[in-house]
Amino acid sequence: MIKKASLLTACSVTAFSAWAQDTSPDTLVVTANRFEQPRSTVLAPTTVVTRQDIDRWQSTSVNDVLRRLPGVDITQNGGSGQLSSIFIRGTNASHVLVLIDGVRLNLAGVSGSADLSQFPIALVQRVEYIRGPRSAVYGSDAIGGVVNIITTRDHPGTEISAGWGSNSYQNYDVSTQQQLGDKTRVTLLGDYAHTHGYDVVAYGNTGTQAQPDNDGFLSKTLYGALEHNFTDVWSGFVRGYGYDNRTNYDAYYSPGLPLVDTRKLYSQSWDAGLRYNGELIKSQLITSYSHSKDYNYDPHYGRYDSSATLDEMKQYTVQWANNIIIGHGNIGAGVDWQKQSTAPGTAYVEDGYDQRNTGIYLTGLQQVGDFTFEGAGRSDDNSQFGRHGTWQTSAGWEFIEGYRFIASYGTSYKAPNLGQLYGSYGNPNLNPEKSKQWEGAFEGLTAGVNWRISGYRNDVSDLIDYDDHTLKYYNEGKARIKGVEATANFDTGPLTHTVSYDYVDARNAITDTPLLRRAKQQVKYQLDWQLYDFDWGITYQYLGTRYDKDYSSYPYQTVKMGGVSLWDLAVAYPVTSHLTVRGKIANLFDKDYETVYGYQTAGREYTLSGSYTF
């Protein structure tokens, strides 16, 4: 039975960047309801990834981390740095809320969806991933789920690492965390990553002429943080990071025209916070500022030529969160304020625009005997579409010790992006997309196996579609998504197993046709063990059939893309207590497959890396 005492002592909103690296049921998570709580008390399906997991998997991108998680389907227009989309439980890529240290990712404000191919893996210390509706807690976008990437680290000392691999991949990273007296801690990081890449596009799918070239990626990152404890209950922090990325890609091309095939992204973020961590009352105030400049251009003409485009956005955020422990649970409440400003020309919108949103929310969690109840409600006041309300509720019943039934219902929404509102084909009268979701689940511990099986349904209305006849965007689409998700983890002797299965039937509710680019079935399996000081890991992933569009000729044709089984092999060896070497083979059997029609994947890839700590 879940211990109430652990909930009472753990509930807190002291930080979105929880430092716990343990993945046990009592690991503290903050993303589900904006306050710290043991993961076992979260009724929504929750997954936590630590930096140790990322190092063990030897992931070189955020997408490689997320693709391993239940309910996640990643599609990408090629290799490193290429445009990618995250589908959670069959919902649109724009229906995933991505947070960085609890603050909305700025880049998603331009396109309406988060492209994590550009976010440096070096910054990721922890990922908290929640499936299901969370608009009642966070507002817009949280229809399919929430991904909270946490950059705060708790690794005193210095680490130097380097890696090399296929397609001329190289990576160099230096980080340090030092204590300045008893109450102050400083963290610094610098990272450089580069790959020559490969030709990502199959011939004939980018216009009248093929582009046989390497499509590489370059990323340079800096990070700094200062944390200070003023007293036993008051603390504060200042944090900033920035990255400078360049991506070469294949684009639609006709002879005689500039070939816009290079992306240059500058992004910087700054935030500061003050926290009060009392015995019964917790509170935090966080302010943040982020600025991104996203160029697409022909390198022969430069970023400032008339053929180039610039998407520039500034985002200002203020969050005030509070939590009070009451009985065997707590009540949380807070206010979010956000302003997004775009420069003229962003997202093909001639004028610059400001969009402001103020949200107030209330959350609650209470344990009564063998029952756990959870609820949340939120009201958003948006400068474009006015006021919108969402709510959710869940109940868990531990009917036998170690076994629990969970039922939940929630509403959520997605606000239209700036291009849909104000672009050349925009419609300023668009309403938010709306969702209603139901889920039922059983979970338990049987013979050493931690397992969970859930079924869900998601009805999405007022989907924003483009009308070919009126050349405008309208709220005229509907989607119906049904799915089953099963997860389990267990040990057999020295072997650790983690497995998940997803079945997703995502359809257009009007035409009854499958939604594009979603795999109908996925199987994911991770096997880890240690032998003679070598740490071994095998990753298996089955991607089922999916549908896409062939845009090489008009009218566009729907194509069916077959399933594929992928294997990765990773090994690490601690040469000394300070030096560790690692090696990995991705796509071990060199399978040829695509997740976006016409865009090739990398095939078999090798990486070799080492890290030295002191």
From Swiss-Prot:
Residues 155-614 form the TBDR beta-barrel domain. Residues 1-20 form the signal peptide. It is a multi-pass membrane protein. Pfam families: Plug, TonB_dep_Rec_b-barrel. One of its GO terms (biological process) is monoatomic ion transport. Cyanocob(III)alamin binds at residues 83, 85, 92, 110-111, 251, 309, 517, 551. Coiled coil: none annotated. A motif (TonB box) lies at residues 26-33. A motif (TonB C-terminal box) lies at residues 597-614. The chain crosses the membrane at residues 158-165, 169-178, 184-195, 217-227, 232-248, 263-277, 279-296, 309-325, 328-337, 353-369, 371-381, 385-400, 403-417, 434-443, 449-458, 473-490, 494-509, 517-529, 535-550, 558-572, 585-596, 602-614. Residues 38-152 form the TBDR plug domain. Ca(2+) 2 binds at residues 213, 215, 249-250, 261. It is found in: Cell outer membrane. Ca(2+) 1 binds at residues 199, 211, 213, 215, 250. Its main location: membrane. Belongs to the TonB-dependent receptor family. BtuB (TC 1.B.14.3.1) subfamily. Involved in the active translocation of vitamin B12 (cyanocobalamin) across the outer membrane to the periplasmic space. It derives its energy for transport by interacting with the trans-periplasmic membrane protein TonB. This is Vitamin B12 transporter BtuB. It comes from Escherichia coli O6:K15:H31 (strain 536 / UPEC). The gene is btuB.
